[in-house]
Amino acid sequence: MGCKVLLNIGQQMLRRKVVDCSREETRLSRCLNTFDLVALGVGSTLGAGVYVLAGAVARENAGPAIVISFLIAALASVLAGLCYGEFGARVPKTGSAYLYSYVTVGELWAFITGWNLILSYIIGTSSVARAWSATFDELIGRPIGEFSRTHMTLNAPGVLAENPDIFAVIIILILTGLLTLGVKESAMVNKIFTCINVLVLGFIMVSGFVKGSVKNWQLTEEDFGNTSGRLCLNNDTKEGKPGVGGFMPFGFSGVLSGAATCFYAFVGFDCIATTGEEVKNPQKAIPVGIVASLLICFIAYFGVSAALTLMMPYFCLDNNSPLPDAFKHVGWEGAKYAVAVGSLCALSASLLGSMFPMPRVIYAMAEDGLLFKFLANVNDRTKTPIIATLASGAVAAVMAFLFDLKDLVDLMSIGTLLAYSLVAACVLVLRYQPEQPNLVYQMASTSDELDPADQNELASTNDSQLGFLPEAEMFSLKTILSPKNMEPSKISGLIVNISTSLIAVLIITFCIVTVLGREALTKGALWAVFLLAGSALLCAVVTGVIWRQPESKTKLSFKVPFLPVLPILSIFVNVYLMMQLDQGTWVRFAVWMLIGFIIYFGYGLWHSEEASLDADQARTPDGNLDQCK
C-alpha cells in the first residue's frame, strides 16, 4: 500500500502540462513588438553589470582580463539564448523556462525551474536597486552611505550586508507602482531609459580609449604601491594582495571565477521569453529579440570593461561606482557627472527589466496551481498580474535592504544557470520525440504571422508526417546505433531521454573533478585523471548516440542549430560556471530550495491544475505540444 502511494506521488511529480498554443486567448494585453523586446532585453541587461559589477570583478577576480570573463559569460548566454529562442517559437506563452520545463520534463522540474527564476528576478531587482542607490550616492557626495554607516549598521558578517540600503527599498517600491499601471506604459519608459543608456555607453567607450593607457594592462607588483595620478588607499582585495600584475593578475582561474559572476550581467535576455502572451508576433519577435539584445550587450560590456581598466589600475577601482571614479581619476571631473546621470537611466531600465518578468513567472505558476491562486489575479483595467507584481516587489525590497551586492549576484547566478541548463536539456529531448500521426500539426501563430510560403511549407510538412508512420522497433544495440526509421519513434525518443540524463551526470562529474580536484589533476593523481578522461569519453560516445537518432521534421520559425552539440555545450558551460561559485552561495541556495520544496509538497502538488485533468486524456510523448509546432 505504501509503495502504491509513493508511486502515485512520483507520477504526480512527473506529470506534464497540456498546452494548446493554437488558441490565442490570454488575460494579458498583446501590445509589444520586436523593437520593444530588444529594448526590454538591452535595458534589463545593461545595468548593474556594466556600471557596477565590472569594477568589482576586475578588482577582485580578473583584473584587465575581465574582457575575457565577459566573453566566456557571453558564450554561455548565447548558447542558452538560442535554446530559449526555439522554445519561444514553439510555446509562445507566459512562463519562460518554467513553462518549457513543464511541458517537457514534468511538474517537479518545472517547479524547481520556476522557483529558481523567481529567485533570479528578485535578486536581479535587489542588486540593481542597490547599484542605483550607490551610483546616486556617489553623485551627491555619499551622504546616504555615511548615514547608513552611522545609524544603520548590521552586525552579521558573512550573512547580511554591513549597511542596510533604505534608498534602494524606496526605488523598488516606486517602480513596482509603475509596473502596475500597464505593460505599454512600462515599455515606453523603458525605451527612453535604454536610448539614453546606449548613448552614455558609447561616450564611455570612446573616452576610455582616448584617455586610457595600455600600461594599466601591464602593471607589475612594484606598481601596487606607486600608482600614477592617484593614491590607492587600499590596494588589497578580499583575497589579499591584488594578484601578480599583468593582463591576467589572478591567473586563468580568476578569469573563470570572474566569468561566473559576469554571467549575471547577461541574465536580462530571458525576460523576453516571459512576454509570450503580450507580444503581437511571438514566434518571430522572441528569437530575434533575444539574439539581438545579447549581441548589443556583449559589445557594450566588452568595450566598457576594456575602457575602464585602461583608464585606471584595476586594483584602484571602486567596488560600488567604478565609472564616475575612473573619470575623476583621469581628470575629467565634468564627465563623471554625465556618466553618473546616464548610469541612473541605465540602472532604471535594468530595474524595470528585472521587475517585469518576475510577476509573470509567479502568475504562470499560480495559474497552474503550483503557487497560491490569489497570485494569479489580473487587474481588469491594466491587464497586469497586480497581486504578483506587488508581492514580488515587496520581497525584492526586503532583499535589497538586507543583503550585499556581490552575495546577491552570486546567488542569482546559480538559479539562472540551473534554469538555462534545464531549457537546453528540454530542447534536446523535445527535438527527438515522436509526433502523433493522427493529428494535423499547427504552428502556434497570431493571425498575421505566417506568409503564404510558410503556410504552404507547413502544409507540406504535415502531409509528409501523416503519410509516413514510424515502423515499430525493438530496443537493441542496432536500434541505438543505427535506427531504421527516418522519423522519431517511441524507442528513439526513450533513447534520447536516457542519453540526456546520462550526459547530465557525466558533465557534473567532469566539472566537479575539474574544479574541486584541480590540485589532484596537477599532481597527476590516477583517480582524477581516470574520472576526467572517462567522463569526457563517455560523454562523446553518448552524444554520438543522440546524433544517430532521427530528428523531428516539424517546422518552427526558429530552431537551435547544430543539434545535439550546441545544447550539450550549453549545459556544460552552465554547470562549469556553477561550480566556480563559493560554498556560502550554495548554502544560501539550499535554504531557498528548502523553502520552495515546503511550498510545493505542502500546497502545489495537491492544487496543481494538471491534477484536475482526466488521467486518461490522450497526451503526446513529447510533452503535449501537438498544437504548438
Swiss-Prot record:
GO terms for biological process: amino acid import across plasma membrane; amino acid transport; L-amino acid transport; L-arginine import across plasma membrane; L-arginine transmembrane transport; L-histidine import across plasma membrane; L-ornithine transmembrane transport; lysine transport. It is found in: Cell membrane. The chain crosses the membrane at residues 36-57, 62-82, 103-123, 163-183, 192-212, 247-267, 288-307, 338-358, 385-405, 409-429, 493-513, 527-551, 560-580, 585-605. Residues 58-61, 124-162, 213-246, 308-337, 406-408, 514-526, 581-584 are extracellular. Gene3D superfamilies: Amino acid/polyamine transporter I (1.20.1740.10). Glycans are attached at residues 226, 235. GO terms for cellular component: apical plasma membrane; basal plasma membrane; basolateral plasma membrane; membrane; plasma membrane; protein-containing complex. InterPro entries: AA/rel_permease1, Cat_AA_permease, CAT_C. Optimum pH is 5.5-8.5. Signal peptide: none annotated. Ubiquitous. GO terms for molecular function: amino acid transmembrane transporter activity; basic amino acid transmembrane transporter activity; L-arginine transmembrane transporter activity; L-histidine transmembrane transporter activity; L-lysine transmembrane transporter activity; L-ornithine transmembrane transporter activity; virus receptor activity. NCBIfam families: 2A0303 (TIGR00906). Interacts with TM4SF5; the interaction is negatively regulated by arginine. Forms tissue-specific complexes with ASL, ASS1 and nitric oxide synthase NOS1 or NOS3; the complex regulates cell-autonomous L-arginine synthesis and citrulline recycling while channeling extracellular L-arginine to nitric oxide synthesis pathway. Belongs to the amino acid-polyamine-organocation (APC) superfamily. Cationic amino acid transporter (CAT) (TC 2.A.3.3) family. This is High affinity cationic amino acid transporter 1. It comes from Homo sapiens.
